[in-house]
Amino acid sequence: MENHFKSQLIQYYEYLQKNTATNSMVEQAIGIKQINLTRYKATLEEEGNLVVVRKGFCEVTGFPADYLSTNKEIIKKVNERKYKETLFP
């Protein structure tokens, strides 16, 4: 991965460690274009390092969006919730 994009991926990851946000909110906060954030989201999800915490209306766009996190404690809780939902649908 090119250094510039790797640096952006790290910034994205670190921002979502401390904030639960949509990609539009992240773009506004740290200035990385949403098209790149979408790519980083897919990469981190595949690695198990990012989860959708909830669906809601974005504070920036007002449209339905996923609220995201890379916080390990939040990831653990979301994964536990998903597991319970598979046991008791």
Question: PLM features: residue spans?
Answer:
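Short, cationic-aromatic polyanion-contact patches
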Residues: 5, 53-82
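Surface-exposed alpha-helical segments enriched in charged/polar residues
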Residues: 14-17, 42
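Short intrinsically disordered terminal tails
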Residues: 1, 80, 84-89
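Short alpha-helical segments that sit at the start of domains
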Residues: 1-15
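A short acidic, leucine-rich amphipathic alpha-helix
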Residues: 25-31
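Short capping segments at the starts of secondary-structure elements
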Residues: 17-25
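Short amphipathic alpha-helical interaction segments
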Residues: 32-46, 54-57, 63
